Regions:
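Histidine-centered nuclease catalytic patch
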Residues: 1-4, 237-267, 276
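Short, charged/polar micro-motifs that form catalytic or ligand-binding hotspots
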Residues: 31-39, 226-229, 255-259
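Betabetaalpha-Me/HNH-type nuclease active-site subdomain
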Residues: 4-8, 196-245
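Structured loops at beta-to-helix junctions and adjacent beta-edge loops in soluble globular domains
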Residues: 2-6, 49, 270
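Short metal-coordination and nucleic-acid-contact micro-motifs, chiefly zinc-binding Cys/His arrays
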Residues: 42, 228-234, 261-265
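Active-site catalytic microenvironments for nucleophilic, acid-base chemistry
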Residues: 52-56, 242, 271
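Short metal-binding segments enriched for Cys and/or His
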Residues: 6-12, 265, 272-278
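Mixed-charge, low-complexity interaction segments
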Residues: 12-219
C-alpha cells in the first residue's frame, strides 16, 4: 500500500494567506497515524526542510530549496540511523523489508566496508555526491508528492523533473517561528514509528550503543535518544551544521514533552545564534 499522493509528479501551492492554526492542524495530521506511512520518509523530509530553512534562496513569494541540498541532508540524517544503529525505516511490504535509502546504503557498504564506521560527511566527495544523486532520484518520487498532498498544497510547490521545491512564504515563516516545536514533535512521531517497526533485539542493541544501563521509562525514549544524539547534540539546531565551537546553550521552554529535560535546550553555531537574535 502506498500513501495517497506518492505518485504525483508536480504540484503548486495554495494561493493567499495561510493561518498558523491551519499549519498546526496540518502538522498534527502528518504526525498522527491518520497520515498513511509505510516508511519514515515523511519525518525525514520534514527534518531536511527544517535543516535547509537557512539555505533557501528567495524568489517571489516563495523560497527555493534544491533537491541536491534537500536530499543531501536527507541522506546525511539517515546515514547513522541505518549504518550505525541498524534501525529499519519501513514497514515490511512483502517484497522487501528495507526502504530504498537502506538498500542504497547497504549496497555502498558492501562495496566499501570501511564506510560503515565513518560519518556521512567523511565519505570521499565523488562517492558522496553519487549517493546523494541516487537518494534524490529514488526517494523523491515516493515522498515529495505524498507530503505535498498531506499538507493540502500549503507547504511547497514542486516538479519532480525540476531542480527543487519552492517553499510557500507563509510556510517558511511558520517553520522558522516554530522550528523548535516542529523539530521536537517530528522526533517524537519518528521515534514512535521506529518503535513500531524495530523489534526488541534492536532496542537492546541500542541501549548498548547509547551506553544506557536501563531503558528510561519505556522503549520510546531510547529511539528519541538516538535521534537527539544524531541530530542535535553536536549540530547547530538552526542550520544543522556540525559545531566546532559551541557558541550558546540556548534554553527554550518546552511545553509539549514536559517529562524530558534533555529536550529543553538547543545548541547553535555563532552565525545562526546572531541571526536568530536579530
Amino acid at each position: 500500500y502506498m500513501p495517497a499522493g506518492w505518485n504525483q509528479t508536480s504540484g503548486s501551492f495554495r494561493e493567499g494567506p495561510i493561518s498558523e492554526d491551519t499549519f498546526w492542524m496540518l502538522f498534527n495530521y502528518v504526525f498522527s497515524d491518520s497520515s498513511a506511512k509505510r516508511t519514515t520518509y515523511k519525518f525525514g523530509l520534514i527534518k531536511s526542510i527544517l535543516d535547509n530553512l537557512f539555505n533557501s534562496e528567495g524568489e517571489d513569494y516563495s523560497l527555493f530549496i534544491s533537491y541536491e541540498n534537500l536530499f543531501g541532508k536527507f541522506a546525511e540524517n539517515y546515514w547513522n540511523l541505518v549504518t550505525k544503529y541498524q534501525l529499519k525505516q519501513m514497514l515490511p511490504d512483502g517484497k522487501s523489508e528495507y526502504s530504498k535509502i537502506e538498500q542504497i546504503f547497504k549496497a555502498l557498504i558492501q562495496e566499501e566496508p570501511s564506510f560503515a564506521d565513518i560519518p556521512f560527511t567523511s565519505i570521499p566527495e565523488a562517492q558522496r555526491k553519487a549517493i546523494i544523486r541516487q537518494v534524490s532520484s529514488d526517494c523523491r518520487r515516493n515522498v515529495i508528492g505524498a507530503l505535498h498532498r498531506d499538507f493540502q498544497a500549503c507547504l511547497y510547490a514542486f516538479d519532480l523533473k525540476g531542480d527543487g521545491i519552492f517553499l510557500n512564504a507563509y510556510a517558511f515563516d511558520f517553520m522558522l517561528k516554530y522550528k523548535v516545536e516542529i523539530e521536537k514533535l517530528n522526533y517524537y512521531a519518528w521515534a514512535k514509528f521506529l518503535e513500531k517497526i524495530n523489534d526488541e533485539s534492536v532496542v537492546v542493541k541500542l541501549l548498548d550503543k547509547l551506553e544506557l544501563a536501563t531503558p528510561q521509562r519505556e522503549d520510546l525514549s531510547v529511539f528519541r535518544q538516538v535521534l537527539y544524539n544524531e541530530f542535535e547534540q553536536c549540530n547547530c539546531f538552526y542550520c544543522g551544521k556540525k559545531l566546532h565551537e559551541i557558541h550558546v546553550d540556548h534554553f527554550i521552554p518546552w511545553s509539549f514533552i514536559k517529562e524530558d529535560k534533555l529536550w529543553n535546550f538547543v545548541l547553535a553555531c555563532p552565525s545562526c545564534n546572531i541571526r536568530k537574535s536579530n
